[in-house]
């Protein structure tokens, strides 16, 4: 059993251990494959492996794209290592020595000339690795460069390197061709170097990876450019290493060749490589706090067979953070150096005995522009108990969320549009989706209508055309649908249902009448018995038998007891009983004729006759009469038609449109007309009336006031880009020499701070192999790496809330943009914004984590001058300044233990400001934006959520000259052009109207979308002389509605029918387009309007499909036949 136990345990543990060695490499692909030799790159840092195992490592790929064969060749490296001398017991400059040997490494990133270009044309990948090593182990970094076509060909594949397996995952971003930075799509533009157009072009920090390519030639003498560009004393540049760096910017670009004088990107990378040659560190997670000991400076022979030392290095022990692969500079031939546990000299102020990095990673600042943000289209269909939705955007979706749906972060793509699928679990309320900064509302009522239509059509699939025509009427939500069902059922089956339902009602009524009659007879008998008993007790005495003690109801019964009980007989059945009270009482309980005296009395009481109007009348009612059935049938059809028409128009909540009849309301101007109300920032407001002369009603003037939605405009100061970064605390210790003697790798980081503890005088702060007190140095270094831009910040200087107000008063047409505490004033009308309730204030900072169209956060406290690490705005890159580093206010402490290496401790904050904000993001105020316009100095947008409110006051004076202003010469002609959408109360329809204006240059008015009875929507529009195209959106109507374009009481002669609501996808409505308050005072639909609407519906339902009428008449005939069978006409015989 023991061996089986271990085998089972091994089978359980082995898959877990195998999975632990699988790591992900993400390759970010653009949305579309652009022209040009673009390549994409990805890399991943892997855990350490023993130094001895590096000689056998080689990348092995299972990807269907072949790896470039030249990487499989063996590259000879000079391995430089250090070791302590056996005769030295204490650390000093002479206590160690370097050893140079030749090793063969296969698969390192030694790229050949034209390799990347050839791999693009031959559709091959370039897979290689870098090594960061100390004296015992190495941390590999795996790189993969593939042509951009791989984004369309592959989804994932697997690469093996040593003991590790790397899953390569291709992820598409929503960027068309650009690089995803700060949630925005940045396109580097090398043609823009010095002139940055405000609001169009910007400067962004972009990640870059460079590989050295060794090639000989006069044009590849890289150190000639080093000598020109930097203050270098490099001599004999003719005999220095020759070649160039090939770089990929942002993970997705065409190759950039470094140095290239006419390419700004190339020179930025060239500057970064030689000013910060170590580049980004290769620390893994958890290695932010580490230490290493400096052993001392050393020289080595490269190659190992050289007669003299050719390379300077610094030996160390501890966690390796930087690449151990480099290229010797003192030879035109590329001499590859592998230096585990040593920092090669990469400073080229003096080019003697130096090297250059084989692979360099870092960040460079590039000019470019951001891709435009495209609006979203959201569709939904009913799926099970919920809805299945899709979101599309031509230019990609940068952000999509929903408070009531399950939106996956894994994006899928279809052709040139990005498609994101998600599921909404409930459809009992409208679905709200935020997509690309827009608030979309999907009206789920239409989805339910579609499912209802689909179900009814499926049940009556033998006649699908008829079933669909009837289903679209039955499935209208609310009382209207039930009224329609009742109307159709009454028409088709009323001749059977009316007598059947009447019979049921009569049966119930007769049953109730019978119950009441029986109850009354019993109560009358009980009353008689009670009176007899009371009278007997008053005159004769008790009615209780002396023998059996039974209480009698009548004197005759008492007399019978007096005769039979003494003789031991039952007075009712004359059965013999024991002459005891208990025996008699027990017998009476089982005796069957104890009620015979009561029955005799009941016969003597005269029964009460039925009244003619109750039970007898119910029995004689002729519910089978054809006259009664026909009368009820007609009455129900008329009543249900009125109820149907009354329920056909829905009254939604404001600020959405309210259905009303034709026309415009009128106001007699006895006094000044004043309106005072609060209006949300996302709402438009339209007020339209006829102002009439109170002395003569025939004189009137048209008043039309249009107030557009609020525009928020802020003058800002662009603070720049906010960065996230990782703070590293490193301890560098060496036994001898001053702290300035060695150059530490963090010196080339953009943000670093160092505290030195030099020449210690305590034995407790020196390891056992140090020479003693008063020597050496402990350097404590703080530096930031893995910098990543996360957002753009803008400080509000001034803020302005404004609305555009237009007034049409008779012939007068005036418009003005008014601010808070400002007024529009004309001769007769005054419109003022008295105040605004807002969450913005001067001095706030607006932070955008992505495109400005997606909204942002409001910061009341944002550091701009003295920033500490961890504050909002701690790491900034302003456009007009250099990189701004934060302060590190914490203090250092050197922790000492006897005979051990000192360790640096830092008591300050180690968490970046960005990570702190994300951890508490719910505590910050957010805002959404739409209709965004921005430059570096000003941002304007509209609030789609209506979170702000304006207090508005409108005053119209009563002093109007009706005699001179009453005549309006403007003439309007109407024509209905086309219609889109569906009738009903779902998403609605859009009516296209051709409106002609003559006799005046401009005219502000409203065009309505109406049928014969009711108007369902309106659009306020400023007409110009000539032909105008106006689109009017509305909701409502029925299958018979013929929608026309109307102006007041005048409508176009020809109307159009809208489609029926069905199971098609429901398109989301932009909230900013749907939020408006329209008030023209038109009357509500009355009784006459109801009859007009019913007639239009009845004519409409039959005009388009005559077979529906035929089918309904067939059902009517069937019900008549069924009535004649079940209820035949009663024949009367002649006497």
From Swiss-Prot:
Outcome of mutating residue 615 to A: Complete loss of interaction with host MAP1LC3B
Q: Which residue numbers delimit the CCHC-type Zn fingers?
A: 545-565, 570-591
Q: This protein's superkingdom? A: Viruses
Residues of the ITAM domain: 611-634
| Signal sequence, start to end | 1-18
Annotated GO CC locations: host cell endoplasmic reticulum membrane; host cell Golgi membrane; host cell mitochondrion; host cell surface; membrane; viral envelope; virion membrane
Enumerate the transmembrane spans. 486-506, 628-648, 1106-1126
Name the segments for region: Fusion loop.
Answer: 757-777
Cystine residue pairs: 29-151, 63-157, 109-128, 133-138, 175-185, 210-247, 234-351, 376-435, 380-389, 405-424, 452-475, 735-770, 739-777, 751-885, 765-896, 780-904, 806-815, 823-832, 863-867, 970-1000, 993-1045, 1010-1015, 1046-1051, 1085-1089
Keywords, A to Z? Activation of host autophagy by virus, Disulfide bond, Fusion of virus membrane with host endosomal membrane, Fusion of virus membrane with host membrane, Glycoprotein, Host endoplasmic reticulum, Host Golgi apparatus, Host membrane, Host mitochondrion, Host-virus interaction, Inhibition of host innate immune response by virus, Inhibition of host MAVS by virus, Inhibition of host RLR pathway by virus, Inhibition of host TRAFs by virus, Membrane, Metal-binding, Repeat, Signal, Transmembrane, Transmembrane helix, Viral attachment to host cell, Viral envelope protein, Viral immunoevasion, Viral penetration into host cytoplasm, Virion, Virus endocytosis by host, Virus entry into host cell, Zinc, Zinc-finger
Family per record: Belongs to the hantavirus envelope glycoprotein family.
- State what protein this is by name: Envelopment polyprotein
Gene symbol here is: GP
């Amino acid at each position: 059993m023991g061996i089986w136990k271990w085998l089972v345990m091994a089978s359980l543990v082995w898959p877990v251990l195998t999975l632990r060695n699988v790591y992900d490499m993400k390759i970010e692909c653009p949305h579309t494959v652009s022209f040009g030799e673009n390549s994409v790159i990805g890399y991943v840092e892997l855990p350490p492996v023993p130094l001895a195992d590096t000689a056998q490592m080689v990348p092995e790929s299972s990807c269907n794209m072949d790896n470039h064969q030249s990487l499989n060749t063996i590259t000879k490296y000079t391995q430089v290592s250090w070791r302590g001398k056996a005769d030295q017991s204490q650390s000093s400059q002479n206590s160690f020595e370097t050893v140079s040997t030749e090793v063969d490494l296969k698969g390192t990133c030694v790229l050949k000339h034209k390799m990347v270009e050839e791999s693009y044309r031959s559709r091959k990948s370039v897979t290689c690795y870098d090594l960061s090593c100390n004296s015992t182990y190495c941390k590999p970094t795996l790189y993969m460069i593939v042509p951009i076509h791989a984004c369309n060909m592959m989804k994932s594949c697997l690469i093996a390197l040593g003991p590790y397996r790397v899953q390569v995952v291709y992820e598409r971003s929503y960027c068309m061709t650009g690089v995803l930075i700060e949630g925005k799509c940045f396109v580097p533009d090398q043609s823009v170097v010095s002139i940055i157009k405000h609001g169009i072009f910007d400067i962004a920090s972009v990640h870059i990876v460079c590989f050295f390519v060794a090639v000989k030639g006069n044009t590849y003498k890289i150190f000639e450019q080093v000598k020109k560009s930097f203050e270098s004393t490099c001599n004999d540049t003719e005999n220095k290493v020759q070649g160039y760096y090939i770089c990929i910017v942002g993970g997705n670009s065409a190759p950039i060749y470094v140095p290239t004088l006419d390419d700004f990107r190339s020179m930025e990378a060239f500057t970064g490589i030689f000013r910060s040659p170590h580049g980004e560190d290769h620390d893994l997670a958890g290695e932010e706090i580490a230490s290493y000991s400096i052993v001392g400076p050393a020289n080595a022979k490269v190659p190992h067979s050289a007669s003299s030392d050719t390379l300077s290095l610094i030996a160390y022990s501890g966690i390796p953070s930087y690449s151990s692969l480099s290229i010797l500079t003192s030879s035109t031939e590329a001499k590859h150096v592998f230096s585990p546990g040593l920092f090669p000299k990469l400073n080229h102020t003096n080019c003697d005995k130096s090297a250059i990095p084989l692979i360099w990673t870092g960040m460079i600042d590039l000019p470019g522009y951001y891709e435009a943000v495209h609006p979203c289209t959201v569709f939904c269909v009913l799926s099970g108990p919920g809805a299945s939705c899709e979101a599309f955007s031509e230019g990609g979706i940068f952000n999509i969320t929903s408070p009531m749906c399950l939106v996956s972060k894994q994006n899928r793509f279809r052709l040139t549009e990005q498609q994101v699928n998600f599921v909404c679990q409930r459809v009992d309320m409208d679905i709200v989706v935020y997509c690309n900064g827009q608030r979309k509302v999907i009206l789920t009522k239409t989805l339910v209508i579609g499912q209802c239509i689909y179900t009814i059509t499926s049940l009556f699939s033998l006649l699908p055309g008829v079933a669909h025509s009837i289903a679209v009427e039955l499935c209208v939500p609310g009382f209207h649908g039930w009224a329609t069902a009742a109307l159709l059922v009454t028409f088709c089956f009323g001749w059977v249902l009316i007598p059947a339902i009447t019979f049921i009602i009569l049966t119930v009524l007769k049953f109730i009448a019978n119950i009441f009659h029986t109850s009354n007879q019993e109560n009358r008998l009980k009353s008689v018995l009670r009176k007899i008993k009371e009278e007997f007790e008053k005159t004769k005495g008790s009615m209780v038998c002396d023998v059996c003690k039974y209480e009698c109801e009548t004197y005759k019964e008492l007399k019978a007891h007096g005769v039979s009980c003494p003789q031991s007989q039952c007075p009712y059945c004359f059965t013999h009983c024991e002459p005891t009270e208990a025996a008699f009482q027990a017998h009476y309980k089982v005796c069957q004729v104890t009620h015979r005296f009561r029955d005799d009395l009941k016969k003597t009481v005269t029964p009460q006759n039925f009244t003619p109007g109750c039970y007898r009348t119910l029995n004689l009612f002729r519910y089978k009469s054809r006259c009664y059935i026909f009368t009820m049938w007609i009455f129900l059809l008329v009543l249900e038609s009125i109820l149907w028409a009354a329920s056909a128009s829905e009254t939604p909540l404001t600020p959405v449109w309210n259905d009303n009849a034709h026309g415009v309301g009128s106001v007699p101007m006895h006094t000044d007309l004043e309106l005072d109300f609060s209006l949300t920032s996302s709402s438009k407001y339209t007020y339209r009336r006829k102002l009439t002369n109170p002395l003569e009603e025939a004189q009137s003037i048209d008043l039309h006031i249009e107030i557009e939605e609020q525009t928020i405009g802020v003058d800002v100061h662009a603070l720049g880009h906010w960065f996230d970064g990782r703070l590293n605390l490193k301890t560098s210790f060496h036994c001898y020499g001053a702290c300035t003697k060695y150059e530490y790798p963090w010196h080339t980081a953009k943000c670093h701070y160092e505290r030195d503890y030099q020449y210690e005088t305590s034995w407790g702060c020196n390891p056992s192999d140090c020479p003693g007190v008063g020597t050496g140095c402990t350097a404590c270094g703080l530096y930031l790496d893995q910098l990543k831009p996360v957002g753009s910040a803008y400080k509000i200087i001034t803020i302005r809330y404004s609305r555009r107000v237009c007034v049409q008063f008779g012939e007068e047409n005036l418009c003005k943009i008014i601010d808070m505490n400002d007024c529009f004033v004309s001769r007769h009308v005054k419109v003022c914004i008295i105040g605004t309730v807002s969450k913005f204030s001067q001095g706030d900072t607006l932070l955008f984590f992505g495109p400005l169209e997606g909204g942002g956060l409001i910061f009341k406290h944002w550091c701009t001058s003295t920033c500490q690490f961890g504050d909002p705005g701690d790491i900034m890159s302003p456009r007009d300044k250099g990189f701004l580093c934060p302060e590190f206010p914490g203090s250092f402490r050197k922790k000492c233990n006897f005979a051990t290496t000192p360790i640096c401790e830092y008591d300050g904050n180690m968490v970046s400001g960005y990570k702190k904000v994300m951890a508490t993001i719910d505590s910050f105020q957010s805002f959404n934006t739409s209709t965004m316009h921005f430059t570096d100095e000003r941002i304007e947008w509209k609030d789609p959520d209506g979170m702000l409110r304006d207090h508005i006051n409108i005053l119209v004076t009563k002093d109007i000259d009706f005699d001179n202003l009453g005549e309006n010469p403007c003439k309007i002609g109407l024509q209905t052009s086309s219609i889109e959408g569906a009738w009903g109360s779902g998403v609605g329809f859009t009516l296209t109207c051709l409106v002609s204006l003559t006799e005046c240059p401009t005219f502000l008015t409203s065009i309505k979308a109406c049928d014969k009875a009711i108007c369902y929507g309106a659009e306020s529009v400023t007409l110009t002389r000539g032909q105008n195209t106006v689109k009017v959106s509305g909701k409502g109507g029925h299958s018979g509605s013929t929608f026309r374009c109307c102006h007041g009481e005048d409508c176009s002669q020809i109307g159009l029918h809208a489609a029926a609501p069905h199971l098609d996808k429901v398109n989301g409505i932009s909230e900013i387009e749907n939020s408006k308050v329209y008030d023209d005072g038109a009357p509500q639909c009355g009784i006459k309007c109801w009859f007009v609407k019913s007639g239009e519906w009845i004519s409409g339902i039959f005009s388009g499909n005559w077979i529906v009428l035929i089918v309904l008449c067939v059902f009517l005939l069937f019900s008549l036949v069924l009535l004649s069978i079940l209820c035949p006409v009663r024949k009367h015989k002649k006497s």
